[in-house]
Amino acid sequence: MTRTNLPRMAVGTLVAGALLSTAACGLSGGSGDVKEAEKTGRVAGEITFRTLQLKPAFTAYVQGVIDAFEKKYPDAKVKWEDVPGDGYNEKLVADAQAGALPDVVNLSTDSFQLLGDRGMLADVATLDGESAKEYVPGAWEQFKLPGKGDGVYAYPWYVTPEILTYNKELFAKAGLDPAKPPTSVEQFFDYAEQIAARSGGQYSAFMADPKGRLPGDWQKMGIPILNEKQDRFTFDTDQAVAWVERMKDLYAKGAMPKESLLKSDDINQLYGGGKIVFGPGSPGFVKDIKQNAPQVYANTQVAGAVTGKLGHIGIYAQSLGIKKDTKHLDAAAEFAKWVTSGPNQVEFSKKATIYPSNAQGLADPRFADRGDGRDAETVARAIGAEQLKTAALDANTPVQWTNQVGDAVVREMQKAIKGEQDARTAVKKAQEEANKLLANAVKK
């Protein structure tokens, strides 16, 4: 039910919003500061390709993709560099300041925003007018930038959808039908209350984890996170207050592990030990449970994510950006398209729990196969793929909801859930603090 975590190899890209804001001050102020490269019609020259923490697990795969590209385009050479997750955005900032960005660079959501907002990335939509139809619409749209029209500033790479994972044995013990999982936030809470009432304190329903639940739960409830101009937070509503009050009530009734209000890093252990009903909403988690807790895996069931009033999930894609002033634009663009092509993304998905952003790749029979319907990992792969076909950006965390904003909101929610302040005060204070942070970010 909580937002899907990025694959482990990408987790290191997520750094504090404050760090991004501060570091970005040293970058060029706009696209006019960087000269736009032009295509020559010849795929040639040496380009640099930077990935994030793919060695050594995926060395053979990536090198194979590079070798095949160089065989097709013998005048082009790809210099591959793989860097650790720690300090990834700081390195991007330093390279941008020094004019040393790679020609093709792996970007997460925040690092894309960091470089894109400052005009450091090429508009890939103008490089090939046919590119848009090659990718899942939700993924392609994700890499547009506010105020820049139909420009798209990175090729979508791999994605990870949100699903619902639960222990069907504990589900049934609580008097719930495993074939009827919750579809709305309100229903999810109703189920959690029943689980708490029937468990006798032997297991919990879900992790409190307000950092992971917000703003997703509110979006699914139809709560407006921002105003129409996208410059003010507007979540201070009766619905948000009701969410806090329900969380407080469920917390008091034992629907969540007490320690999960402050941390959620032990969920694998709790779920694997049969101590919690709902696991993380990630296909990768299902694979981990299969490997590490086979007895619980046998009782694991998966379903479509709780989507509430939205009716669809969001989409979070890794991407490949192209340096705006690359000296070899043809080679860089062709290589980025090569890496993100259907066949190459499908092959990658066989080695990691990821999904193609490429429409052809997502249409591969592998992603429709549910087997006999008994293996949770196989079913999870099919459900995730099906949901990606209708994924849309209005279910994504807004870029304005930085880590700083999230932390500020969560602090107030934690106080209210523990009973240290009332729900209405918590939501009001959270919105006020969030708007202060947003205003300060705009000034910078």
Where in this protein do the model-derived segments appear?
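Short, well-ordered beta-strand elements
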Residues: 41-56, 76-81, 103-104, 153, ...
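Short, low-complexity disordered leader/linker segments with a strong preference
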Residues: 1-48, 71, 425, 435-444
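Short, solvent-exposed loop/beta-turn-alpha elements that line the ligand-binding surface or hinge
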Residues: 125-138, 181-183, 198, 203-205, ...
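Helix-loop-helix "hinge/cap" segment bordering the ligand-binding cleft or interdomain interface
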Residues: 71, 75, 146-212, 226-261, ...
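Extracytoplasmic/periplasmic substrate-recognition and gating elements
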Residues: 67, 174, 245, 252-256, ...
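Hinge/lid segment of periplasmic solute-binding proteins
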Residues: 109-161, 217-218, 301
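C-terminal capping/gating helix-and-loop segments adjacent to ligand/active sites or protein-protein/ligand interfaces
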Residues: 378-430
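Extracytoplasmic "Venus flytrap"/periplasmic binding protein-like
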Residues: 68-137, 173-175, 180, 270, ...
